[in-house]
């Protein structure tokens, strides 16, 4: 029997290494000087029986961060991708109930943010939200390095009253643009 983990929903199950492999493959894809197997093996040293799936994600991120070096700078993008995957999971679960789904429609984001009291009530009025939503491209989130996405998360992304993130980078940038241009004719 393998390592038992506690899922985010409280359920316990045996650690499925194929899920970790999928995550590590996606996080290293197309980046020079980084190794999926190295990330996976080094992170597994930190896995202990009873840890949560959230702790496993944190271990993967920390392992990638520890590997950032002037000689292998792409580890910062691995750490950033892992962080973004976790952010997608957390925001999706909190806002539209679909864990891991990158972005809900802009209308849904605005409604949730307003209902949570985190966005101004008239934000989005007078805009073609379907058109603006078509400009959201989740692949842009992977242009951040780790320090960039971590700073954005810590300082700027909106969180609910439980301190859970409810906003993703492109929704934030779109909301800022809509707010700044709202009085333009």
PLM region descriptions:
Residues 1-185:
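Extended catalytic cores of very large enzyme megasubunits
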């Amino acid at each position: 029997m393998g390592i038992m983990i506690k899922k985010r929903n409280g359920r316990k199950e045996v650690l499925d290494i194929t899920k970790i492999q999928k995550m590590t493959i996606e996080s290293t894809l197309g980046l020079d000087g980084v190794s999926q197997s190295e990330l996976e093996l080094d992170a597994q040293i930190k896995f202990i029986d009873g840890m949560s799936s959230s702790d496993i994600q944190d271990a993967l991120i920390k392992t990638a961060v520890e590997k950032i070096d002037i000689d292998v700078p792409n580890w910062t993008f691995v750490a950033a991708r892992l962080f973004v995957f976790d952010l997608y999971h957390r925001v999706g679960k909190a806002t539209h109930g679909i864990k891991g789904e990158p972005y809900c429609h802009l209308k849904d984001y605005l409604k949730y943010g307003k209902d949570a009291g985190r966005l101004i009530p008239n934000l989005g009025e007078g805009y073609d939200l379907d058109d603006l939503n078509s400009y959201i491209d989740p692949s842009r989130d992977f242009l951040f390095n780790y320090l960039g996405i971590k700073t954005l998360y810590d300082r700027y992304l909106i969180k609910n009253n439980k301190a859970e993130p409810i906003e993703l980078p492109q929704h934030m940038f779109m909301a800022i643009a809509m707010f700044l241009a709202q009085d333009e004719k």
